[in-house]
């Protein structure tokens, strides 16, 4: 989720644009078709996911049973849905960089001393985030020789043990945070990526209840401690904390236990589940400030996906988005009784191909449109155009029709949309907008549009170098190689 603002509903203004550009309909359509055809690797490719694992090598290393469970999960992985739900940062809604997120945990059976294996998704560091690519790999521990340290709890200890394969080893070494995050994890939220379980989103998100519905009432008044202006899923915290304690092997059988919930780097709360006196009802939830010190850091962390009301549910309740603009699997889960409709097409883009545009030119309305794949004036003969182009070179003042074409090349009205598509990795969508405006045969002139496309290409090279391990650990705090110098967004919470 994106960073929340104390001003209340400010975040609702940019989530619709995130939903418009981050996972385009063409990606969803292609990835879904390949997944339904049984081509999980092809679905990943369509969704911008780089696969860094080999199920055959998993069978040799960890046994056929674990490999079979992995293959079943890969067949039902909806990578476009995973991209839809991954944590994002404000203000642009880009993927939160430098994360390793556990999607599934496989406990080894019949192998004494074997450590759990995690299917993980990784996002690259911010300086190498061109294309908003995601990598999919396996993780079975930490290697002390590379200086990696384990996390507390179920995600490892300070012991040293090996990686699955050389490629995963290299990927972990070049990643800033190679071990699975305790806060950003989806192994307890399989409905956010597993096509078999997407219907669970309705219950887990609270969409089956009105806002502030009939969940267990926290006591005492938690809202005095919960940061104001943030859509915390307080009515789900008790149930989510029970799931967390059970998954991490800390369940007491009575529902009692303690977990932490994080709000950014400096704010934490303790969620204490207090068993009912007679043991016959759900545990009560007591919320207190987390004490400073090591005690709280060793407690289980409520997953980020459990902490907040999902943005799609907020948008629907606020009337800020149409249900047909949501991912189809999300829409069917949140609004199961909606009439069957075809998936929403891509958003309408300005200056559609084939439609002439009107320009006020010397007291008359003239047209400019695509002719033989190039944006051209329609109401001036070739001799007049040659004469006007020569005069423009001498005087620097072209006639309005030529000036409109030049402006379309250098700084078109659609530049913001092109930039957002490039930022989110939708190269094909960005080029479609440009070609719809200027034509497929156009030669770009110097200006902001050409600069954006060139920077996008440079940043893709930077990502390739990062993937290949040829660029070291990356730059310092300043803009990375190929960066267009935009300030990094604030991270979530």
Show where each model-derived region lies.
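N-terminal membrane-targeting/anchoring modules of bacterial envelope and secretion proteins
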Residues: 1-228, 232-235, 245-249, 437-438, ...
């Amino acid at each position: 989720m994106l960073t929340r603002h104390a001003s209340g509903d400010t975040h609702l203004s940019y989530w619709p644009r995130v939903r418009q550009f981050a996972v385009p309909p063409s990606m969803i359509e292609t990835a879904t078709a390949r997944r339904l055809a049984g081509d999980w690797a092809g679905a990943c490719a369509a969704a911008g996911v780089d696969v860094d694992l080999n199920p055959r090598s998993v069978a040799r290393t960890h046994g056929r049973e674990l490999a079979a469970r992995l293959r079943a999960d890969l067949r039902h992985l909806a990578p476009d849905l995973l991209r839809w739900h991954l944590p994002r940062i404000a203000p642009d809604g880009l993927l939160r960089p430098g994360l390793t997120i556990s999607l599934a945990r496989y406990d080894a059976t019949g192998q004494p001393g074997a450590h759990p294996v995690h299917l993980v998704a990784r996002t690259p560091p911010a300086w190498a985030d061109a294309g908003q690519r995601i990598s999919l790999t396996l993780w079975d521990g930490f290697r002390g020789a590379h200086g990696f340290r384990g996390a507390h709890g179920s995600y490892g200890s300070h012991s040293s043990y090996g990686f699955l394969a050389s490629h995963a080893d290299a990927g972990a070494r070049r990643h800033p945070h190679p071990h699975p995050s305790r806060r950003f994890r989806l192994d307890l939220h399989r409905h956010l990526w597993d096509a078999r379980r997407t219907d669970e989103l309705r219950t887990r998100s609270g969409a089956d209840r009105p806002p502030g519905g009939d969940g267990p009432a926290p006591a005492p008044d938690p809202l005095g401690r919960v940061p104001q202006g943030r859509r915390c899923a307080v009515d789900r915290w008790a149930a989510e904390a029970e799931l967390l304690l059970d998954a991490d092997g800390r369940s007491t059988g009575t529902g009692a236990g303690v977990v932490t919930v994080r709000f950014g780097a400096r704010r934490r709360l303790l969620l204490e589940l207090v068993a009912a006196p007679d043991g016959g009802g759900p545990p009560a939830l007591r919320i207190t400030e987390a004490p400073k010190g090591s005690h709280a850091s060793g407690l289980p962390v409520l997953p980020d996906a459990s902490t907040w009301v999902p943005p799609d549910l907020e948008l629907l309740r606020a009337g800020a988005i149409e249900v047909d603009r949501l991912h189809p699997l999300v829409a069917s889960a949140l609004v199961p009784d909606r009439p069957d409709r075809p998936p929403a097409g891509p958003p309408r883009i300005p200056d559609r191909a084939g439609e002439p545009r009107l320009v006020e030119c010397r007291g008359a309305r003239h047209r400019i449109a695509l002719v033989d794949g190039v944006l051209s004036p329609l109401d001036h003969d070739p001799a007049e155009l040659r004469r006007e182009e020569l005069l423009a070179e001498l005087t620097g003042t072209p006639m309005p029709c030529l000036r409109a074409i030049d402006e379309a090349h250098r700084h078109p009205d659609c530049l913001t949309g092109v930039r957002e598509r490039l930022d989110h990795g939708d190269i094909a969508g960005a080029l479609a907008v440009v070609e719809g405006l200027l034509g497929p045969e156009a030669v770009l002139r110097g200006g902001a549009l050409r600069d954006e496309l060139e920077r996008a290409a440079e940043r893709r090279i930077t990502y390739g170098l990062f993937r290949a391990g040829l660029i070291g650990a990356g730059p310092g705090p300043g803009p990375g190689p190929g960066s267009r110098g935009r300030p990094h967004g604030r991270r979530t919470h």
